[in-house]
Amino acid sequence: MSKSTKKHSAAMTKVDRSTVYPLKTAVEVVKDTAYAKFDETVDVAVKLGVDPRHADQMVRGAVVLPNGLGKNVRVLVFAKGEKEKEALDAGADYVGADDLVAKIQEGWFEFDTAIATPDMMGVVGKIGKLLGPRGLMPNPKVGTVTFEVGRAVKESKAGKVEFRVEKAGIVHAPIGKVSFDAEKLQGNLVALVEALVKAKPSAAKGTYIKKISLSSTMGPGINLDISDVTANI
């Protein structure tokens, strides 16, 4: 048995799969069961009572986590003129138009999020098939197609997380690193769940939040007490 397998097995013994943990305890267990040599990301999976095959039950949006993500987010902005300057002043890593489109067409993707002013979407549309599958296509629904590029850049840098329900009705999102203080991870998780509650489609019937689980990159999944999480909203 390899060292990594032994560590994973040891981590698994610390988690009772049949137990739903209070928020505070769940975060402590996630931190305790992380065993990788790198600073693992803490991820959340939320099972929603929706059927995303129906357009009126799609859940999509974004939230700025109060305690950030613990990583440097590389922001690219498609803009010209005054908006180009505004984006640069706000801290954007790359700003341009056709020049950036040409680089991306050549296979360059050294950025984590893309923002565009509405008047640039005709240009950005040329590379939609390249950006879309990578989750990088600017979209007005999550605030990445906007004339307020300065605010959008600052939000992305501060730890803005985009979410979208998958076919199985699950939303996956990062909420920080295992090195974060437990209180910061708790705050980020509550902020994410609150955003999901606000994004509830009117067509969704029955129980909306069915399950919440937490895990580190390499660690086991921990089931949370939903009522304890929502009580903090």
UniProtKB/Swiss-Prot annotation:
GO biological process terms held by the UniProt record: regulation of translation; translation
TM region positions: none
Paired cysteines (S-S): none
A Pfam family assignment: Ribosomal_L1
Keyword set includes tRNA-binding: yes
Stored CDD domains: Ribosomal_L1
GO terms for MF: rRNA binding; structural constituent of ribosome; tRNA binding
An annotated GO cellular component: cytosolic large ribosomal subunit
UniProt entry keywords in alphabetical sequence: Repressor, Ribonucleoprotein, Ribosomal protein, RNA-binding, rRNA-binding, Translation regulation, tRNA-binding
Subunit structure: Part of the 50S ribosomal subunit.
NCBIfam families given in the database record: rplA_bact (TIGR01169)
Function: Binds directly to 23S rRNA. The L1 stalk is quite mobile in the ribosome, and is involved in E site tRNA release. Protein L1 is also a translational repressor protein, it controls the translation of the L11 operon by binding to its mRNA.
Family (UniProt): Belongs to the universal ribosomal protein uL1 family.
HAMAP family listed in its UniProt record: Ribosomal_uL1_B
Protein name: Large ribosomal subunit protein uL1
Organism: Trichlorobacter lovleyi (strain ATCC BAA-1151 / DSM 17278 / SZ)
